[in-house]
């Protein structure tokens, strides 16, 4: 069997999803988990776009080992030099440079003729090659490009030194049979392709990104660019978990393998969902909460008799745990440690002590603590940034005949701070009181409530998106059995993220 390389672009293309904004530490957390997952390449970002993105790419390049770290750059000297400056400390650095090749892009975006595009592509690859031996070249909008011209550009890029050639379906226009044939023709028409790996990057505008990627693999592509949960521009990208599990499950027709540790898929999906603020749809293949659920009586009967009647893969294969322990207020540290280990959380003694305190507080409010409760508890810790403010208490006065009023107490560097405010509702009143204490007035872009568990004592999760005066958007989360407390914690989590960014960059509100 031949190996297919997995190029993860969650931190670059995935972060281009509307409303997603990750800080450097959040990107580093995801990059570390991607390395643990076993991806071959992490595209850490597009350094020229902002100082913050360059800083995040540099951080990942320095800290994450055992994986290729790539930076994106347009076919321009400044982009390529900036990309190299960001990844120069990586153990295995890659410069990924690109230029569009379709006539529509040449005419309306680049305003270049074909000769100039070929020259720019060659110059970009040659410059990148001066910095690193690992250079990837992408022909943007390749699937809508004239095949003969595309092959000319590809051949020129390989001769200039590109070691990977990427063929993007940038706008998700391709159809699987057509795209597979397209890949086959490129390999036939470009005699020097034996010097480079052929890669594909498919978007999901028609819901065909995974199908197109599989068709490309069947026809000679040996690298697939994808994202966790399929996030990305517009309708998203090829989903890493779907392409990997398709290759794993259907070896009879897809005789290929990847280096992915499949048992890390679920945890990686949860981490990306939580840090980006993009919930996974319940019916999402592989990682959705309904992916291994059976409601039909006939299906339930079949699964109870023999799992393979209605399941083509075991949920444990992708890291979805099967609960064997029921935890409650009488459960001890050892039981908690064992269950967290089964869920994929390896804790130090100090971390276990902190987790146990939170667990006991949660167990006092609930009869049984489920896996979902534990995951929510741990993910709240994962999302933490250094806390300028912590929630001490809040009091609410509200009713059908009175104006909602909130009194909020926060702690900053050991000092207790308190203020009160009225609002259009109890949540609005809490947020206005927090604003008065902190002196910040971010715009609340989004507020949503999700049930983490079911039942009367269910945990509720509140997700907020806050935007500061500079246009920076952060995601805040809070979890509690009390939805007002969850709302306060989510807003404060967002406030602390904004303050963390200000301090890191020396900015002012």
From Swiss-Prot:
Region Regulatory domain, residue ranges: 390-509
Pfam families per record: HCS_D2 (PF22617), HMGL-like (PF00682), LeuA_dimer (PF08502)
Domain called Pyruvate carboxyltransferase: residue spans: 4-266
UniProt GO cellular component terms: cytoplasm
One of the GO biological process terms: L-leucine biosynthetic process
Protein name: 2-isopropylmalate synthase
InterPro entries: 2-IPM_HCS-like, 2-isopropylmalate_synth_dimer, AIPM/Hcit_synth_CS, Aldolase_TIM, LeuA/HCS_post-cat, LeuA_allosteric_dom_sf, LeuA_bact_synth, PYR_CT
Cofactor(s) required, per the database record: Mn(2+)
Catalysed reaction equations from the record: 3-methyl-2-oxobutanoate + acetyl-CoA + H2O = (2S)-2-isopropylmalate + CoA + H(+)
Location relative to the cell: Cytoplasm
UniProt keyword list: Amino-acid biosynthesis, Branched-chain amino acid biosynthesis, Cytoplasm, Leucine biosynthesis, Manganese, Metal-binding, Transferase
Gene3D superfamilies documented for this protein: 1.10.238.260, 3.30.160.270, Aldolase class I (3.20.20.70)
The family this protein is said to belong to: Belongs to the alpha-IPM synthase/homocitrate synthase family. LeuA type 1 subfamily.
Task of the protein: Catalyzes the condensation of the acetyl group of acetyl-CoA with 3-methyl-2-oxobutanoate (2-ketoisovalerate) to form 3-carboxy-3-hydroxy-4-methylpentanoate (2-isopropylmalate).
Annotated Mn(2+) binding sites: 13, 201, 203, 237
Subunit structure and binding partners: Homodimer.
Source organism per UniProt: Carboxydothermus hydrogenoformans (strain ATCC BAA-161 / DSM 6008 / Z-2901)
Molecular function per GO: 2-isopropylmalate synthase activity; acetyl-CoA C-acetyltransferase activity; manganese ion binding
Signal peptide: none
E.C. numbers: 2.3.3.13
Pathway annotation from the record: Amino-acid biosynthesis; L-leucine biosynthesis; L-leucine from 3-methyl-2-oxobutanoate: step 1/4
């Amino acid at each position: 069997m031949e190996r297919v390389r997995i190029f993860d672009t969650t931190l670059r293309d995935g972060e281009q999803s509307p409303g997603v904004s990750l800080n450097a530490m959040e990107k580093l957390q995801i990059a570390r988990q991607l390395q643990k997952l076993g991806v071959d390449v992490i595209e850490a970002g597009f350094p020229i776009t902002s100082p913050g993105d360059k800083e995040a790419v540099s951080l990942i390049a320095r800290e994450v080992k055992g994986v290729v770290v790539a930076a994106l750059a347009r076919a321009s000297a400044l982009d390529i030099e900036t990309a190299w400056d960001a990844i120069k400390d990586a153990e295995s650095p890659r410069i990924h440079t690109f230029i569009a090749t379709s006539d529509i892009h040449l005419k309306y975006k680049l305003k270049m003729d074909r000769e100039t595009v070929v020259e720019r592509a060659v110059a970009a690859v040659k410059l990148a090659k001066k910095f690193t031996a690992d250079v990837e070249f992408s022909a943007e909008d390749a699937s809508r490009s004239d095949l003969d011209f595309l092959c000319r550009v590809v051949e020129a890029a390989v001769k200039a030194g590109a070691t990977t050639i990427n063929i993007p379906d940038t706008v998700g226009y391709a159809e699987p049979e057509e795209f597979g044939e397209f890949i086959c023709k490129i390999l036939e028409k470009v005699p020097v392709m034996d010097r480079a790996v052929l890669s594909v990057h498919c978007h999901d505008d028609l819901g065909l990104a995974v199908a197109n990627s599989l068709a490309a693999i069947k026809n000679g592509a040996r690298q697939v660019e994808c994202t966790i949960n399929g996030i990305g521009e517009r309708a998203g990208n090829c989903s890493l978990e779907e392409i990997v599990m398709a290759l794993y499950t259907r070896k009879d027709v897809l005789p290929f393998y990847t280096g992915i540790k499949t048992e890390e898929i679920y945890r990686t999906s949860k981490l990306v969902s939580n840090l980006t603020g993009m919930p996974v749809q319940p019916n999402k293949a592989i990682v959705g909460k309904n992916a291994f659920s059976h409601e039909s009586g006939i299906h339930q009967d079949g699964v109870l008799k023999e799992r393979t009647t209605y399941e083509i893969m075991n949920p444990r294969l992708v890291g979805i745990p099967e609960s064997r322990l029921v935890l409650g207020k009488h459960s001890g540290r050892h039981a908690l440690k064992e269950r967290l280990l089964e869920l994929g959380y390896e804790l130090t003694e100090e971390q276990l002590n902190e987790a146990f305190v939170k667990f006991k507080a949660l167990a006092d409010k609930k009869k049984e603590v489920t896996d979902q409760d534990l995951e929510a508890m741990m993910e709240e810790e994962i999302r933490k940034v250094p806390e300028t403010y912590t929630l001490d208490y809040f009091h609410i006065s509200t009713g059908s005949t009175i104006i909602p009023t909130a009194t909020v107490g926060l702690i900053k560097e050991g000092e207790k701070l308190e203020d009160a405010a009225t609002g259009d509702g109890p949540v609005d009143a809490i947020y206005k009181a927090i604003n008065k204490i902190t002196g910040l007035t971010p715009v609340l872009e989004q507020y949503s409530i999700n049930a983490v568990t079911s039942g009367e004592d269910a945990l509720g999760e509140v997700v907020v998106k806050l935007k500061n005066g500079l246009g920076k958007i952060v995601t805040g989360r809070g979890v509690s059995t009390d939805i007002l407390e969850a709302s306060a914690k989510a807003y404060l989590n967002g406030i602390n993220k904004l303050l963390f960014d200000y301090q890191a960059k020396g900015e002012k509100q």
